[in-house]
Amino acid sequence: GILFKALLQNKNHQHIVVFEKDIEIIWIMFHILDFSSELQSARLMVLQTSSLDIELFSNFCSSKPFFQFSRIYFLELMSHYYERFHEDVLELNKKLVQDFKDSILSHGNDPLDALQGIEQFVYNLPQMITHPSYKELLSKRKGISDTAIIVSTGPSLTKQLPLLKKYASKATIFCADSSYPILAKHNIKPDYVLSLERIPLTSEFFNNDFGEFDKDILFVLKSYVHPHTTKYLQKNNRNFMLVSTYASFINYLKLDDFGYFNMGFSVANMNFLLAIHLKHKNIVLIGQDLAYAKDGLSHTKDYSNLDKHEGHFQRDKNKYTTQAYGDNGKVESSFVWTLFRHNFEQDVANAKKNYYITTYNCTEGGARIEGTIEKPFLWACENLLHKDLNKPFEKLEPLSLNKQNEFLLKAYYKVYQSIKHCRDFSNKFIKSYDKIKNSFMSLQNSQENETLIKEIIKDIDKIKTQIDELYNTQKDLMQILGPLLTQFELNLARIYVLNPKTKEDAFNK
């Protein structure tokens, strides 16, 4: 307690966060010293580790100011007493580090990636506006089925296909783009096929013609998908729609009928979240291994891109080991699957807490997904699927031609305006950049020039204020600038906390 009081005397310490397993120790401290004002202002925060759940970790690591200073995170032991709980401390540290990483990744780290998404979104706009809207989907199909089965392409999928075929009429079947050709091969018709990747390789899952099989399937595409995806679907007159996630450029266009829902990092996450919004009570996962099979396979044997994953098992071995399904030892995972799994675990916790949805992991293999109920697929079929659904589901209609033309014209105008915003922004800040760069070059040759240092800092602050104003007023720029500014601020925090002791230290800072 005395240590906390001393640390809190330093005005630079905005918050002190204490993780404590034995909360009685904290109560004793509160009886001895008065921390009422520090607790009320949240300068002192006490979290009992045994009561922390996935959602709390995620919210903590993505909130201000903790996220902004995530690159200088460290977990400090208060005394040697806590060394006896080293396993608990290491586990806590592991969770915090992972959640900070996930939060950073969720903000993006590449402006070029953001630009690719915007470019493909603009290219897809005519297809989105002239096809059925997300609003139409929700109005006609929400709540018509209790149980959703989400089909992914993990190594365990093959053994589940016979049961899936037998019970397909009794559940809503959502499948990943990569699972679609596999289900077609086994004549198992999904109700929804989802796709969200931006790359042309993923579009190739639709470069086929399954004829009558495709009738009544709805292909739901994230509005960022590669244009080849819609080209292949149009070629065979398949039913598709484009749906938007929450993003500043998309929101700027105000095409609200065609969104919005968060789609996560993978098509399996997207399937899961759409199943939530369509008001299913139970969600069953199959083929969701998120780990390599014992023989090193990354996907089911029918997966068309197996050759693209050769050598990955050897590359990842012993780097991303995690708990196995059914608590059967450990399995080998990958960086991307670990990210997907953590994203899934957050979604599962959210679905249970806020939507009262039960998630069953019936993969019977792969990695454990915390928060799911692990059951054999046969159990789920026999206990959750009792009657045939009224399939095919109600047909979706596009907007009227007049409404389509109205949205197309408004979107064109907004895109044109955004291009102008970007050009104005570029021209203005290139001049400011050149000025600061020239000043900085002069500074390197004159370390004693404190006046010049102050002038440079003043110019930088002025530009930062201007960027902040644009960031808050021109929402279309946010999506492009967001990843760059976030990474810049995270790195700047490392410099911000430095405490210069000499003039040279101040100069370097």
Question: Where in the sequence are the language-model features?
Answer:
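Phosphate-binding loop/pocket of nucleotide- and phosphate-handling active sites
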Residues: 297-347
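N-terminal donor/sugar-recognition subdomains of glycan-related enzymes
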Residues: 2-148, 155-172, 181-185, 192, ...
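Phosphate/pyrophosphate-binding betaalpha-module
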Residues: 220-221, 225-226
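Glycine-rich phosphate/pyrophosphate-binding loops
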Residues: 20, 179-180, 187-197, 275-301
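Short, basic, glycine/proline-bearing loop/turn elements
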Residues: 146-150, 194-196, 250-261, 322-332
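Extended, hydrophobic alpha-helical segments in both membrane/secreted and soluble proteins
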Residues: 173-179, 219, 268-271, 287
